[in-house]
Design a protein with these regions (language model features):
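Bacterial N-terminal signal peptides that target proteins for export
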Residues: 1-10
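A contiguous strand-loop segment
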Residues: 25-126, 159, 366
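A short, structured loop/turn motif at beta-sheet edges
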Residues: 100-102, 139-147, 271-278, 320-322
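Bacterial N-terminal signal peptides
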Residues: 9-19
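Structural recognition of the beta-strand scaffold that forms the well-ordered cores
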Residues: 39-41, 105-108, 174-176, 184, ...
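C-terminus-biased signal that marks the final domain/tail of proteins
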Residues: 24-39, 47, 52-53, 66, ...
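Compact, glycine/acidic-enriched structural inserts
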Residues: 58-72, 113-156, 349-356
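Aromatic- and glycine-enriched pocket-lining scaffold segments that form the walls
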Residues: 145, 149-187
Length: 371
C-alpha cells in the first residue's frame, strides 16, 4: 500500500470514528469458563434514537420474511428450525443479537463507512436479505458456526434501506456456537468476507482485518506488572500496579475499544463457568458503558428522557451451554435473566416480546437492618 493510500485510509478511519461516537459504538466479547461454558456478551450503544429493545421469544416453526426488495419483489422467506430468544429492535423482528436452542449466538454491530453489500439481482430476490434480516436468518437456520459458513454461500445480502436510518444498515456480525467456534462476517467492497480466526472481541469500523493488524502494536500488554530494573545502581520500579498495561488506549473510538476489550478478556480472571463466567463478562463490559454525551441532544424530550442515562441502551450476556440470557438496561443496572431451557415454547402460537426497560425490578435492594 503506497503512502497516499495509507493517508486516505487513516483519514477514513478518523472520520468514521467520529460518526460512530454519535451513533453506534458497540463492544462484543467472549469468555470461556473452566467447565467449557462459552459466554457471548455485548453492549448496545446507540445515541441517535431509542431502539426500543425487547426480549423476544420465538418458537420453532415461526415464519419469517425479509424486507421488500428495491423493485418491490418479496425477499427471502424462511421458517425457524429452532427456538430463539434475543433482543429485537424498533418494534420489528429485527434481531440485534440472540441465541437459538442449539446454543448458537449472533451479534450485530455497526460498521459505518466500510460496509458495502452485494448488488441486488432481481432474479435472485428469493435468496436476498436486507442487512438487518441476517441475524434472524442465521438464528432460525443454523445450529453451528460450521453450518453458518456453508449457509452464507447460498444467500445474498443486498443494500435494502432501513427507514429509521435512511440507508442500508452498515453492520457486521459475530457468530459463536456453544463449542466456542466463532466467525466474524463482513460485507466490504460488495463481497462476503468471513474471518475464521478471531480474537474473541469485536467493535466497529474499520473492518476486522485492520483491528487484527492494529493489535500487533500492543503485544506488550500483560496482567502482571513489569519488574523493576537497575539503572546505574538505581532501582527503577513501576509506580504502582498496572505497569503491564501502560499504553492501553482509554478513549471510546472503535480501535481503542477493540484493544481494551482484547486486553481485558486476555487478562480476565479464570472462571468456573455458568454465572461465574457471566459475572466476569458483565464486569468487563462495564468499562465500555457510554455517558450521556454520546446521545444526540436534538432528540425529542420523550426520547431524551429514555436515553438520559447514556448511549448504552442495554448490555446482554448469553450463556450458550446453559441457554440463559442475562441483561441490564440503561435505566436499571440490576441484572435480570431469562432461562430458555425452562421456557415453554410449545405454548406459543406466535412470538412474544417483552420490553426490556421498566420491568418490575428495583433499582436497588434495601438492606437496612431492622432496629
Amino acid at each position: 500500500m503506497n503512502m497516499s493510500k495509507i493517508v486516505s485510509y487513516l483519514v477514513a478511519v478518523a472520520l468514521v470514528s467520529l460518526q460512530v461516537s454519535s451513533a453506534g459504538a458497540c463492544t462484543f466479547i467472549t469468555l470461556t469458563g473452566a467447565d467449557g461454558t462459552v459466554v457471548a456478551s455485548r453492549t448496545m450503544e446507540w445515541g441517535a434514537f431509542d431502539l426500543s429493545p425487547q426480549m423476544t421469544f420465538v418458537p420453532s416453526g415461526t415464519a419469517f420474511s425479509a424486507m421488500t426488495m428495491p423493485d418491490g419483489q418479496d425477499g427471502a422467506e424462511w421458517v425457524a428450525k429452532y427456538n430463539i430468544v434475543g433482543v429485537t429492535l424498533l418494534g420489528q423482528m429485527l434481531f440485534g443479537d440472540g441465541v437459538n436452542s442449539e446454543g448458537l449466538n449472533v451479534s450485530l454491530l455497526y460498521l459505518p463507512g466500510f460496509a458495502e453489500y452485494q448488488a441486488y439481482e432481481p432474479d435472485k430476490a428469493s435468496i436476498s436479505l436486507a442487512p438487518v434480516d441476517v441475524s434472524g436468518f442465521i438464528l432460525g437456520h443454523f445450529a453451528t458456526v460450521a453450518e453458518v459458513r456453508e449457509g452464507l454461500k447460498n444467500i445474498r445480502v443486498v443494500p435494502i434501506v432501513t427507514p429509521e436510518l435512511g440507508e442500508a444498515a452498515p453492520v457486521h456480525f459475530s457468530v459463536t456456537d456453544k463449542s466456542g467456534d466463532q466467525i466474524v462476517i463482513e460485507y466490504v467492497d460488495g463481497a462476503l468476507g468471513v474471518y475464521d480466526k478471531t480474537l474473541g472481541v469485536l467493535t466497529n469500523s474499520p473492518p476486522y482485518d485492520w483491528h487484527i493488524n492494529n493489535a500487533r502494536n500492543y503485544v506488550n500488554m500483560r496482567a502482571d506488572a513489569w519488574p523493576s530494573r537497575d539503572v546505574n545502581g538505581i532501582d527503577i520500579a513501576p509506580m504502582g500496579y498496572g505497569s503491564g498495561l501502560i499504553g492501553l488506549p482509554g478513549d471510546f473510538t472503535p480501535p481503542s475499544r477493540f484493544i481494551r476489550a482484547l486486553a481485558w478478556t486476555q487478562t480476565a480472571r479464570h472462571t468456573s463457568g455458568g454465572e461465574d463466567t457471566v459475572h466476569e463478562s458483565i464486569r468487563i463490559l462495564s468499562n465500555f458503558v457510554l455517558p450521556m454525551e454520546a446521545v444526540d441532544k436534538k432528540l425529542n424530550p420523550a426520547e431524551l428522557e429514555v436515553l438520559k442515562y447514556g448511549g448504552t441502551q442495554y448490555t446482554v450476556s448469553y450463556d450458550l451451554q446453559n441457554l440463559k440470557v442475562y441483561f441490564q438496561t440503561s435505566d436499571n443496572p440490576s441484572v435480570r435473566s431469562v432461562d430458555m431451557s425452562t421456557f415453554d415454547f410449545d405454548a406459543l402460537s406466535a412470538p412474544i416480546k417483552v420490553p426490556m426497560r421498566n420491568l418490575a425490578t428495583s433499582f436497588a435492594t434495601d438492606v437496612t437492618p431492622a432496629s
